[in-house]
Amino acid sequence: MKFDRHRRLRSSATMRDMVRENHVRKEDLIYPIFVVEKDDVKKEIKSLPGVYQISLNLLESELKEAYDLGIRAIMFFGVPNSKDDIGTGAYIHDGVIQQATRIAKKMYDDLLIVADTCLCEYTDHGHCGVIDDHTHDVDNDKSLPLLVKTAISQVEAGADIIAPSNMMDGFVAEIRRGLDEAGYYNIPIMSYGVKYASSFFGPFRDAADSAPSFGDRKTYQMDPANRLEALRELESDLKEGCDMMIVKPALSYLDIVRDVKNHTNVPVVAYNVSGEYSMTKAAAQNGWIDEERVVMEQMVSMKRAGADMIITYCKDICRYLDN
């Protein structure tokens, strides 16, 4: 009987390493940090074990730890002292993220700062834009100028990449126009253009204090049941000038990561979101899984699906890679 002997290429660890198709590197990782304006706070987020809200005055130690591990890309999320109905704190000169960015750039010039460009952390209603008084929904076109102001303010503070996440129609085009007019034509846009209205975001909203005070975000984030819609969003953002595309969430949407990869030649970013991280942590803390092996399998699955970069809360990946 003749048959194929596939096991020949699995015969030893060295052989398996040699023929491995996908690899996870420290250079692939973008690490989120939650920054609060209050002093002397380092508070573990209950629903995100191992992740902390950190004060501006304590930020340097967190940045040093991440940098020493080999992380070279950071994404800041702000928890401001005060909020209003239009998210003013997102774009003021001394906003919490602007201050954090200046601290990071002063410490490490080669640390890439990816700026999450949204309003939800700064609005008193928790939505991602200006609320229309009549429809009680986010007003798409009135929100766009505020996003542009936020992006420019973030770049002025030292951000290297703008990552708009509020899923307004036309947000890439308007931000690109605004950056170019301000002379920042070399700043790339990493669009959250394929972002689903997912239940996996829950722990993040605890961490960033950004849960909507009414309703939900289903009128601007995508339906988890839809696949072709992701390609329409991708096509629009590419036309508008995005340089990289985020798929969020990642693990339950690996088919979408592959679709996006197959339909574009720009880098694809998988966001390993808070709920995915927390489920893994909970299972590991109960002794049900081997955390290191499961995390690395998750990472390589995202790379295999087509992700060029991964946004992850798990900085321990760097330690795993060192081992």
From Swiss-Prot:
Binding, 5-aminolevulinate 2: S274, Y313
Names of the cofactor(s): Zn(2+)
Keyword terms: Heme biosynthesis, Lyase, Magnesium, Metal-binding, Porphyrin biosynthesis, Zinc
Pathway(s) of this molecule: Porphyrin-containing compound metabolism; protoporphyrin-IX biosynthesis; coproporphyrinogen-III from 5-aminolevulinate: step 1/4
Record GO terms (molecular function): porphobilinogen synthase activity; zinc ion binding
Top EC class of this enzyme: lyase
Chemical reaction(s) catalysed: 2 5-aminolevulinate = porphobilinogen + 2 H2O + H(+)
Active-site feature positions: K195, K248
Transmembrane segment boundaries: none
Residues that, per the record, bind 5-aminolevulinate 1: R205, R217
Cofactor note: Binds 1 zinc ion per monomer.
Binding site residues for Zn(2+): C118, C120, C128
InterPro entries xrefs: ALAD, ALAD_AS, Aldolase_TIM
Pfam families: ALAD (PF00490)
EC number: 4.2.1.24
GO BP terms: protoporphyrinogen IX biosynthetic process
Binding site for Mg(2+): E233
Cellular component annotations (GO), alphabetically ordered: cytosol
Family of this protein: Belongs to the ALAD family.
Role played: Catalyzes an early step in the biosynthesis of tetrapyrroles. Binds two molecules of 5-aminolevulinate per subunit, each at a distinct site, and catalyzes their condensation to form porphobilinogen.
Quaternary organization: Homooctamer.
NCBIfam families recorded: PRK09283.1
Protein name: Delta-aminolevulinic acid dehydratase
Gene name, Swiss-Prot/TrEMBL: hemB
